[in-house]
């Protein structure tokens, strides 16, 4: 198991990388090593036929669409976002720009049915922020803090996030396979990465007027 990612495993003597999520696997490596691993798994478990990421043929992995074009792999949640927006009925909603309204924890408490909708939406946001859409991580963390006693203001906020996502649902993460070769074992035990990442944030902690924000060292 990798030292820097507990859900990712590697074979110390082969070119093989396995990402796990409960009983779903993503496998990358040399074709012969992949076939060996699949044969080992099929001896112990009842496995579905494996799917392969082919050129211009997207593969769905738990709502995340994996597409390969040339030597670049794209990770997208576009279809997942569209589906969840339909479920939450936010097709006609547009986010305010800029969003200047703090979450009012003293507004009207949600009914049991509304709370069910709120918690489902928060769960969807959690999956999105933890996979491809890291741009909503701060918004998700703030909204999720209100899961115990959500209000109408909190529900409006989570729906605004989905309205934002619907407006830029095509954003994705790209991975270029032309990056310099590194031994898998070195990658999985390293505390740094040769990849260049850029992150941007417009979170305004100083301008947050919520009372509970003043009691936290970070959000």
Question: What is each stretch, according to the model?
Answer:
Residues 3, 13, 20-22, 54, ...:
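Eukaryote-biased feature marking scaffold/signaling PDZ-domain proteins and nuclear chromatin regulators
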Residues 49-85, 89-104:
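Non-catalytic, low-complexity flexible loops and terminal extensions
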Residues 1-21, 183-189:
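Conserved beta-strand/loop block within the catalytic cores
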Residues 4, 50-53, 171:
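A short, aromatic/hydrophobic, helix- or strand-capping loop or linear motif
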Residues 16, 80-219:
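Divalent metal-binding acidic/histidine catalytic loops
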Residues 21-22, 61, 198-201:
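Short hydrophobic beta-strand that contains or immediately precedes a catalytic carboxylate
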Residues 6-10, 55-58, 143-145, 178-182:
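Short amphipathic alpha-helical segments embedded in low-complexity Lys/Glu-rich regions
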Residues 11-46, 65-76, 145-152:
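Catalytic palm subdomain of template-directed nucleic-acid polymerases
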């Amino acid at each position: 198991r990798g030292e820097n990612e507990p859900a990712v495993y590697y074979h110390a003597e082969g070119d093989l990388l396995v990402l796990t999520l409960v009983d779903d696997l993503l496998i990358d490596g040399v074709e012969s090593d992949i076939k060996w691993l699949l044969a080992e798994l099929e001896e112990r478990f009842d496995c579905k036929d494996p799917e392969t990421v082919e050129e211009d043929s997207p593969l769905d992995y738990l709502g995340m669409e994996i597409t390969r074009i040339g030597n670049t792999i794209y990770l997208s949640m576009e279809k997942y976002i569209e589906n969840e927006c339909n479920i939450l009925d936010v097709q006609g909603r547009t986010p305010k720009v800029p969003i200047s309204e703090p979450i009012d924890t003293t507004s009207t408490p949600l009914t049991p049915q509304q709370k069910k909708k709120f918690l489902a939406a928060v769960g969807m946001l959690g999956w999105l922020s933890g996979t491809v859409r890291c741009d909503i991580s701060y918004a998700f963390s703030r909204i999720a803090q209100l899961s115990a006693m959500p209000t109408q203001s909190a529900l409006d906020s989570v729906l605004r996030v989905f309205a934002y996502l619907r407006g830029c649902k095509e954003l994705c993460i790209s991975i270029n396979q032309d990056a310099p070769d590194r031994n898998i074992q070195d990658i999985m035990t390293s505390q740094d990465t040769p990849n260049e990442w850029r992150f941007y944030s417009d979170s305004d902690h100083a301008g947050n007027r919520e009372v509970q924000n003043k009691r936290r060292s970070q959000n």
